[in-house]
Amino acid sequence: MDAIVAVRVPRAAATLLAAALLAFAAPARAEAPPKALQLKVAGHALRAEVAATVEQRMKGLMFREKLGANDGMLFVFDEPGYHAMWMKNTPLPLSVAFVDGEGRILNILDMEPHTLDQHMAAGPARYAIETNKGWFAQRRIKPGDKVAGLPKAK
């Protein structure tokens, strides 16, 4: 007669083992980097990462330590409105241009790192473009100037 050996595994260890196996079996779900567009802001080239989802817009440029000289982020809002930006958890000084649905810059504001101040659009904005602080001023870009290459409104 064969002997049957029973092994007792403590419940906590079995739970940990099951969790570890599930973690390795689950497919990796790394967040894909935002896609980027090549914009022309009053004729000046700007590579802009696109923040089109609520999650992407909420994160924005938070925790970024650097931004290329001609790089930025394009925020695409679901509806035109008096949208506002803040600098929570954002270590870079930035400028923001609010843009209407026709691609016309409504206003441009400078923003300081790690502040909770609200920086608001001067009119119904469909987009906002964040760049390194002073990017618009250095190129003499002003309200009324046009942005080309924006994604079409829904």
Residue ranges: model-predicted function:
Residues 8, 24, 145-147:
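A generic structured-segment signal
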Residues 13-24:
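Bacterial N-terminal signal peptides
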Residues 26-30:
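Sec/Tat signal peptide C-region and signal peptidase I cleavage site
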Residues 31-154:
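Compact, glycine-rich, soluble single-domain proteins
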Residues 1-9:
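N-terminal secretory signal peptides that target proteins for export/translocation
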Residues 8-13, 45:
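N-terminal regions of proteins, emphasizing targeting and processing segments when present
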Residues 2, 20, 126:
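Short, flexible active-site loop motifs that bind/organize anionic cofactors or intermediates
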